[in-house]
Amino acid sequence: MTDMPTLDAIRQAPKALLHDHLDGGLRPETVLDIAGQVGYDGLPSTDAGELASWFRTQSHSGSLERYLEPFSHTVAVMQTPEALYRVAYECVEDLAADAVVYAEIRFAPELHINRGLTFDEIVDAVLAGFAAGERACAGAGCPIKVRLLVTAMRHAAMSREIAELAIRFRDKGVVGFDIAGAEAGYPPSRHLDAFEYMRDNNARFTIHAGEAFGLPSIHEAIAFCGADRLGHGVRIVDDIEVGLDGDVKLGRLAAILRDKRIPLELCPSSNVQTGAVASIAEHPFDLLARSRFRVTVNTDNRLMSDTSMSQEMYRLVETFGYGWSDIQRFTINAMKSAFIAFDERLEIIDEVIKPRFAVLIG
């Protein structure tokens, strides 16, 4: 096989996914089906193809705030245990079909209480869906491990409660905590109590930072909050200078981010949709990769971006000319950065990822 991977070949490659929102990855048919079952009549279309196109078009908004608006529809159909279970199960199926071997999926339980569910009931339903999906995929010959991150919305005041939820379920499939939502006006430091609680319990967390807002958000996430990873972090490019001779000079913040090997959960297609970057070609992914930051490739929201891990990888291959060794490096970066135990990470790298890439590389 040549060193320039095709999309079909990339679909065979093992992948590790760290940044994917459960409520951003539903199948359009499932949105319609559940909407009919629960009596939700707010959808813009009753045709699956048209609905998928609508989500993609609406999400290509140029701002994070407008990008988040279509989620009102997916969240509306995820308010019962049955719906949450189904969406979680299908998420596992869809990822396994794309050769994802490890994934951390995140969602905000506080958005799913409209029909009276408790946080524990919500998380139980999602974890049950994941577990059933894993069993089904293993039986079908495409094993996958899926774990959960619970997210608190940064504009709300529930982050400590959600952090406590993460710890309650830490031995049942929840491997970490996150904050998400509009960055401007809602700095990570508003949630210090939640992050301190996670650290006090020796637990891991990531923070959406440097997506729509700049370096101050990244600085707070690292220096004040102690984030283990950064969700997006794309604006770290504002602290990097590239000279006319191509020489790269890192600012103090960029340098410590690289030196501490803090993983960047980069989501190329999503970053274009939200206006964080103008195009894939102008995305700093390649600059960061060449500068040896811990870069990872992610989908963010598969429905909204009409994407998959294979498609995200292929867009980078097309744009930056990456080969198999690059894709393998990005995949191992992600697996090294996962919130599961070291021996579990090593097992997946040594027994799944490296052997399968060896076959692809030839």
From Swiss-Prot:
Gene3D superfamilies the UniProt entry points to: Metal-dependent hydrolases
Co-factor(s): Zn(2+)
Membrane-crossing residue ranges in chain numbering: none
Binding positions for Zn(2+) per the UniProt entry: 19, 21, 208, 300
Entry note: cofactor: Binds 1 zinc ion per subunit.
Any one GO BP annotation for this protein: adenosine catabolic process
PANTHER family for the chain: ADENOSINE DEAMINASE (PTHR11409:SF43)
Residues annotated as the enzyme's active site: 211 (proton donor)
Organism: Mycobacterium ulcerans (strain Agy99)
Cellular-component GO terms for this entry: cytosol
Keyword Metal-binding: yes
Family in the record: Belongs to the metallo-dependent hydrolases superfamily. Adenosine and AMP deaminases family. Adenosine deaminase subfamily.
Species classification: Bacteria, Bacillati, Actinomycetota, Actinomycetes, Mycobacteriales
Molecular function in Gene Ontology: 2'-deoxyadenosine deaminase activity; adenosine deaminase activity; zinc ion binding
Keywords: Hydrolase, Metal-binding, Nucleotide metabolism, Zinc
Reactions catalysed according to its record: adenosine + H2O + H(+) = inosine + NH4(+); 2'-deoxyadenosine + H2O + H(+) = 2'-deoxyinosine + NH4(+)
Function in brief: Catalyzes the hydrolytic deamination of adenosine and 2-deoxyadenosine.
Stated name of the protein: Adenosine deaminase
Entry keyword annotation includes Zinc: yes
The EC number(s) this enzyme carries: 3.5.4.4
UniProt: substrate binding residues: 21, 23, 181
Residue(s) at site: Important for catalytic activity: 232
